[in-house]
Amino acid sequence: MNYIVFDLEWNQPYSNDISFMKRTKMPLTGEIIQIGAIKLNENLEIVDSFTMYVKPKYLPHMHKHVKALTGITNQDLNRGVPFRAAYSHFQQWCGKDYMLLSWGADDILILRENLLLHKLKSIDYDSWADAQMIYSFHRYGTTQQYSVAHAMEDLQISTEELSAHNALHDALFTAHI
């Protein structure tokens, strides 16, 4: 079995964007704009990586806070592929026998929302684990939430050359933890 450590970046609607809810016909936290993942083998060794920009369908213009946080531009998104294609590539890359992991539940929840939005089969929670809770429990015997930055510092893992809030970088940080 492989372990797929994934991270997502997503655009969000402005709070007063009622037309967004009319277009989606459902409440939505945000629209995925980048998928990043690291594949680990059964020995927890990194064997591959995946990254792809997703061209948004419902939120075509970057929210100013998301743009500032991620550095993702409209030009990056214009080079992306539609969500259905991006997710299909991601699934093919994952293979057949794998467990998904993410830092906290936000990424799996936004993925499930976007799968529902695009009428694709949802992820089963049995095939996902919360790396943040695993870290917290094994390191401190608690379920307290710790940031990736805290865990990296705690475990003395260097992140100097990579920036946070890039889906591939964040997945790599989590894989190292």
Residue ranges and their predicted role:
Residues H65-A86:
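Metal-dependent phosphoesterase signature
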Residues V5-N11, T24-M26, F50, I72-T73, ...:
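N-terminal start-of-chain detector that recognizes signal peptides
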Residues M1-N43:
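Entry/capping segment at the start of metal-dependent catalytic domains
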Residues G30-I35, K39-T70, Q91-I177:
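Metal-dependent phosphoesterase core characteristic of DEDDh/y 3'-5' exonuclease domains
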